[in-house]
Amino acid sequence: MLYDKDIRLPLFDFLEDNYGDIIILEEKQMGRSRADIVMVGRDNNIYGVEIKSDADTYARLGRQVKDYDKYFDYNIVVVGTSHAYHIEEHVPEYWGIITVELEDGEVDFYMLRQAKPNPKMKWKSKITLMWRPELAKIQEWNNMPKYKDKSKAFVQGKILERMPEKISEEVLKKQMCELLFCRDYDTIGDDIKDFKSKSK
């Protein structure tokens, strides 16, 4: 039986082999659920990846699917062999499916179904993936006012108000992914403090 901890690290290698140059972000709270993996690709798409090991059940999956669908351009579920024959009944047809099993002592992955574009993604949710200093960079790139004394939610709304007339979806996707590729969890605390001090 494979557990989440057995799957996670080898999965990163499999995703890199299949999707090329990627970056994996820390787990992301999204509504009432938490994304196991958030993957950013050089194709300017953000992928949500849910892991269902052999030890997991489908109890929360329905709610998780709704939450993933709000945030990500593509979604993928990774399942142990105990779920492989039934998973298609539990996720939408546009979700990708990767199966995982133990083969000769090695964790082996198989792309059962490629992910398709998620038709339910909501920009209002997706933009919340960005931290305040990253939003400030998007404002700068798009010649927007700085709104230094305004909340993160206010700035998110102002960015989205400019779509699609002044900021196209493709431009915002590219800018978000470029910033996420540069995200540094070791320095972000200092970056946020610096941003707040300059906003006073």
What does each model-found stretch correspond to?
Residues 2-43:
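Active-site metal-binding core of divalent-cation-utilizing nuclease and nuclease-like domains
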Residues 26, 50, 98-99:
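Structural signal for conserved beta-strand scaffold positions within catalytic alpha/beta enzyme cores
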Residues 32, 45, 83, 105:
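Surface-exposed, flexible loop/turn segments at secondary-structure boundaries
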Residues 37-39, 45-55:
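Conserved catalytic cores of phosphodiester-cleaving nucleases, focusing on short active-site segments
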Residues 43-44, 70:
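Structured loop/turn residues at beta-strand edges in well-structured enzyme cores
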Residues 56-99:
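Catalytic cores of nucleic-acid endonucleases
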Residues 96-200:
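Non-catalytic C-terminal interaction segments of nucleic acid-processing enzymes
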